[in-house]
Regions:
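Compositionally biased, intrinsically disordered low-complexity segments enriched in polar/Pro/Gly
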Residues: 1-232
C-alpha cells in the first residue's frame, strides 16, 4: 500500500518522495455547469460546460527520531523545494524549463496509478513546542551523525548531555569547531528538524492533451483500463 511521488527525469538524486506514514489524501472533482437565465420560470435549466481537472491534496507526517527517518525527512523537504522551481540561471544548460511533471502513485492500479501532477503548493510548520533533531551531513549530502537538540521554553537551545559535544559542532581539517548549522570549509554542515511534523502538499493533475484526445473514451475509463494509465 505504498504512496509516493516519482520524477521520471530527476534532478540530482531526487527521484522519489516516499511517505513514511500513510498520508491523508483529499481528492476532489468539480463539474461545471452554466445556467440558462430563462424568464417566467421557477426552475432554470443547466448546461454542462466541462469537468475540471481533479485536485489532490496530501497531509503527510514525517519524523526524525531515527537516522533513516531523519534522512527521509530532509530529502522530502529538498524534493518539494526542487520540483516547485524552474530551471534558471545563466550557467544552467536547461534554463527556462518549467517545474518537472511528477507521477503520483497510491493504493493500486485503478485508484492513483502513474497520475501526472504538478506541485502547486506545499507548506510545513516548524513548531516551537517540540524537540528538534540535528544531523551532520558531508559535502556530498550524506548523513554523518545525528544528535538530539532540546528546545526550551525560553527559546534557548540546550544540548542533551548524553550526546558528545562533537556531534553538535562542525569540525574542520585543523580540528577547529564552529557553531551548529554553520558550514565550515565545505567539510560538513548541520541542519535541525522537528522530531515530528506535518507537510501539506497540493497537486494539480496535468494530462497530456495529445494522449487524451487520441486514447480517451468513457467506456475505457469506466472499465478501469485508462485508470491504470494515469487517468482519474
Amino acid at each position: 500500500m505504498s504512496v509516493y511521488l516519482l520524477c521520471k527525469n530527476p534532478i540530482a538524486n531526487l527521484e522519489r518522495l516516499h511517505f513514511p506514514y500513510t498520508p491523508q489524501i483529499d481528492y476532489s472533482q468539480d463539474v461545471k455547469h452554466e445556467i440558462y437565465g430563462l424568464t417566467h420560470t421557477n426552475y432554470q435549466p443547466y448546461a454542462y460546460t466541462r469537468s475540471e481537472n481533479p485536485s489532490i491534496n496530501l497531509s503527510c507526517k514525517f519524523s526524525a527520531h531515527t537516522e533513516s527517518h531523519f534522512v527521509m525527512a530532509e530529502q522530502a523537504l529538498r524534493f518539494l523545494r526542487t520540483y516547485s522551481k524552474m530551471n534558471y540561471g545563466r550557467t544552467d544548460p536547461q534554463r527556462g524549463l518549467p517545474p518537472r511533471i511528477l507521477n503520483f502513485f497510491a493504493y493500486g492500479a485503478t485508484v492513483f496509478n502513474d497520475v501526472p501532477v504538478y506541485i502547486s503548493k506545499f507548506n510545513m510548520v516548524f513548531p516551537e513546542d517540540i524537540d528538534y533533531v540535528t544531523g551532520t551531513f558531508d559535502s556530498k549530502g550524506q548523513l554523518v551523525s545525528g544528535s538530539r537538540i532540546k528546545e526550551t521554553t525560553t527559546g534557548v537551545q540546550t544540548r542533551d548531555p548524553r550526546i558528545p559535544s562533537t556531534q553538535v559542532q562542525n569540525q574542520d581539517t585543523n580540528g577547529a569547531t564552529s557553531p551548529a548549522g554553520e558550514v565550515k570549509n565545505n567539510q560538513t554542515y548541520e541542519i535541525s528538524l522537528p522530531v515530528l511534523f506535518t507537510v501539506n502538499i497540493s497537486l494539480l493533475v496535468q494530462q497530456n492533451l495529445h494522449k487524451t484526445v487520441n486514447e480517451f473514451t468513457l467506456e475505457k475509463f469506466a472499465t478501469g483500463e485508462l485508470m491504470t494509465k494515469g487517468y482519474v
